[in-house]
Amino acid sequence: MITRVKIYFLFAIIGTIMVSCRKDTPPSLPQGSVNGGKRLVICDEGGFGYNNAAVSVYDPTNNSTVINAYAAANSNQSLGDVLQSVTEFNDKYYFVVNNSGKVIVSDKNFVRLATISGFISPRYILVVSNNKAYVSNLVLPTNANQTNYIQVLDIATNTISKSIRLDGWTEQMVQSYGKVYVTNQNKKYVYVLDALNDGLDSIYVGSTNACIVKDANEKLWVSCNASAANNVSARLIRINPIADTIEATISLQTTQNSISRLCINGDGTTLYYLMNDVYKMDINAAVCPTTGIIAQSTHTFYGLCIDPADETIYVSDAVDYNSNGKLYRYQSNANYIGTYTTGIIPGFMLMD
């Protein structure tokens, strides 16, 4: 996931020269583009502080995108300020709106069903049972000693049922063997929650960490951040979730860049990650690839998603962080397919 601190500073700079914020009129939604069938749901973060977060939808069937799908389904209402991520469960979408401190629940046609408030600065949501989900929260490194929590969400009543103290900037989560593994952007641990009783444990990984995915062997891959100041290279580590131990460490041979997005293909055998360029790595590899399969070039790569069915690669482009973004589509061998327009700052993507 893109390190939000970098984005905050970027917006602080950009904000001094912004004089207006364009508000597009939501289009009519073509039948088939957002109603049923396979589609890519794109979280358009919007400008920080501008309350213009939106949802774009790419439909592979007619090879087109619909911008402002949520607004069009909800009387032109905005989702709020900074749409961080989305999760699907039981034919509902859970949109995590970071700077608005809320989660919006909608049906598959993007019609709002509920708004859940009371979060600190929510990042990601992970559903662990039919009535329970965890929500991670952001605390900036400058406030590293501030108390932070993982919120427990009752998805039957759409309320926060409990808060679990977990200091630092909690980020992505994945479930394995009845446990939930939580990355942390300003702590050198991956935290482990018992999904049944919320008991807390941790695994020391040696550096701050951001992304996590589960492979075909039920092993967990975590992206550990680089630190030029401490001469620490970015790394991928593999965790055995039965023993909760690190069983492999792969250096990415750079102290200047960190992985911003980490994905895995549908059968869980190939990792894809974004570190300026797009990289591809087999889960059995002993070393990292030295070159990417898709070069960033003059673009501003920001989001990454892999179609679990056919391994189509989707890469989003934030362009200038102020105007509409772009979506690039590639075959699994990196052959270019097409370019599509999205809303402002397309980030997290979900193939549904």
Where are the regions a protein language model picked out?
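Bacterial Sec-dependent N-terminal signal peptides
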Residues: 1-5, 11-40
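Repeated scaffold domains used in trafficking and secretory/extracellular systems
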Residues: 30, 80-85, 120-128, 168-177, ...
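Short glycine/acidic-enriched loop and turn motifs that connect beta-strands
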Residues: 46-50, 100-102, 139-143, 187-189, ...
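A short beta-strand motif characteristic of beta-propeller blades
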Residues: 64-78, 110-116, 158-164, 197-204, ...
